[in-house]
Amino acid sequence: MQAATETIVAIATAQGRGGVGIVRVSGPLAGQMAVAVSGRQLKARHAHYGPFLDAGGQVIDEGLSLYFPGPNSFTGEDVLELQGHGGPVVLDLLVQRCLELGARQARPGEFSERAFLNDKLDLAQAEAIADLIEASSEQAARNALRSLQGEFSRRVHALTEQLISLRIYVEAAIDFPEEEIDFLADGHVLGLLEKVRTELSTVQREASQGALLRDGMTVVIAGRPNAGKSSLLNALAGREAAIVTDIAGTTRDVLREHIHIDGMPLHVVDTAGLRDTEDHVEKIGVERALKAIGEADRVLLVVDATAPEAADPFSLWPEFLDQRPEPGKVTLIRNKADLSTESIGLEESADGHVTITLSARTGAGLELLREHLKACMGFEQTAESGFSARRRHLEALRLAGQALEHGHSQLIHNGAGELLAEDLRQAQQHLGEITGAFTPDDLLGRIFSSFCIGK
């Protein structure tokens, strides 16, 4: 536990007026401040109703005082909470009183940072506090709560323990060569390595789902000119975000619209129609469209259901096939069902391709698309599954997987125990970055500075 020399104070509730406002204090002076502000000795971990006093003994406000001696507190330090009325003037007066008594204004996220430094939370749990506050849907809030309760961290720790066991075995064999262990022939090493790689892939998949719920999914609408891409964007956005005409090539640049489906964030990107063109401006738009396709979480490939080429849309554009994400991230949209003989509906092929027939103009079938996008974002997860994750977590998991892949290759092709041991060490270090076991101070500063003041 790291003993703080400074006492910090901040308003812990949201800005503005409210029924209740909370001022939070943490540090070695919290106990003295409890007596000075309340005018009496407070019993630990009990709520005391009474006045909050200024330096002259005048009443600032009335409310509840709660004192939590460390280490049994949120930060691991002595903590004082003053719960009064939620007026900004009253709360500012309480903060000023604490500043007079020797505290300083807390930095954003400093309470959570102290909890992390005092081993009350690991880094993934601390980040989950901010994720829970910022959650834009019930599912995102549930995932953040599970991360705060340690679900993500437990999964990472389990992977780390498996890596440590494998490292001990491999490095012991290296240190005692007289045992003459053949790493390639030793099925124990290969079996453990395969097991940890499989479990890491599972965690990566669930973390990716959690990150989509937290950050939102980027959906790119792509297709031929005049397929109804801009009409689909407008239908999803619920407003005229894009210009719609019968003239092919109206959209020449990338248009971005941020929407919510049942509180779940969605970043929808409308792109220029994919076609060969001599128009310089339109050509730039097509290049940007292909770039957006390559960066998308999901691509909605829109085809005009009344056009002859709609029968086999995936064979139309080699450029799209080169730039698209993995096939499982492409949804085929057969638009203009109101002008064709096709029925509104959703079909899933044996190989997992989803096709939705709809009409962007009338809105028929649009609810099917919304439900499909929600499912792609993990909306159907139960309360007992899923956890919140961030982009930095995904990168750490990716690098850990890359190290294990390299180690596996070294083992299979070279039987190289020394190189495998180094790859295992690197994988463990990348996993440690998630929970804060191997996290640089500058990264910690950036993470906690993004928190609310008072958290």
UniProtKB/Swiss-Prot annotation:
Its cofactor is K(+). GTP binds at residues 226-231, 245-251, 270-273, 335-338, 359-361. Gene3D superfamilies: P-loop containing nucleotide triphosphate hydrolases, Probable tRNA modification gtpase trme, domain 1, tRNA modification GTPase MnmE domain 2. It is an enzyme of class 3 (hydrolase). One of its GO terms (cellular component) is cytosol. InterPro entries: G_TrmE, GTP-bd, GTP-bd_TrmE_N, GTPase_MnmE, MnmE_dom2, MnmE_helical, P-loop_NTPase, Small_GTP-bd. It holds the Pfam family MMR_HSR1. (6S)-5-formyl-5,6,7,8-tetrahydrofolate binds at R24, E81, K120, K455. One of its GO terms (biological process) is tRNA wobble uridine modification. It comes from the Bacteria. Keywords: Cytoplasm, GTP-binding, Hydrolase, Magnesium, Metal-binding, Nucleotide-binding, Potassium, tRNA processing. Binds 1 potassium ion per subunit. It is found in: Cytoplasm. Belongs to the TRAFAC class TrmE-Era-EngA-EngB-Septin-like GTPase superfamily. TrmE GTPase family. This is tRNA modification GTPase MnmE. The lineage of its organism: Bacteria, Pseudomonadati, Pseudomonadota, Gammaproteobacteria, Pseudomonadales.
